[in-house]
Amino acid sequence: MAQLTRDALRNMNRPLAAAEVLVLGASYREDVGDTRYSGSELIVRRLSEMGAELRVHDPYVPHWWEFEKQDEYPSPKHSLKRFFRGQEKLAKLRIEQDLKKALCEVDAVIFAVRHQPYLDLDPDEVVETTGGPIAVIDCFGILNDAKIKRYFELGCEVKGLGRGHVKRIKDEVREEREQMYLQMNKKAHVRVRGS
C-alpha cells in the first residue's frame, strides 16, 4: 500500500516525502475496535519510513497502543517498530475521531479497513473537504466502480490492490474528457466562423 500511495502521488507530480496521508481504519477488520495484528500498522510504519506525514481515522478505535506505547507494547523488544527505520515520531500518532477534520488538507487517503462509514463516503464531499484532487488508495475493494470513476472525474489518482480494471476506468474518463473538449472546440470554431 505504501508503494501504491507513492506511485499515485508520483502520477500527480507530488512526492510522498512530507505528504499528508490519511489512513482510514486502524482495526484488524471491519466494524470492530481491536488493533492487534492490524494490517494498517504495517502500512503506517512503512509510510513513516518513506517520509510521509500520517493521520489515522477510525470510528471504533480511541487509542492505538501499538504506536502510543510502541517501546513496551505488546512487550519490551517485541514491537514491530524494530523492523522499520524512523519510527520514533509515531509514538505521538493519535487516532482522529472527527472524519472531516482528519480529511482536511491531506494529499492522499488510504481506505485500509472496510468500516461501514467509509463505504458511505461521497467522492465529491471527500475531495471538497481535502481541498482538491488527492491520491486515493483502495486496499479491500471498498470503492465501487462508480466511485472510482467519480474520483477520476474530480482529478484524483486512484490505485487499488487487486483492482486491475482501475486503469480501464481511468482511460474511459480521459477519453470522455477528450471527446467533450473536441465538441467544445468544434462549437467554438463554428461560432467564430459564423461571426
Regions found by a protein language model. Name each.
Residues M1-S195:
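Structural/interface elements that position substrates and couple domains in central-metabolism enzymes
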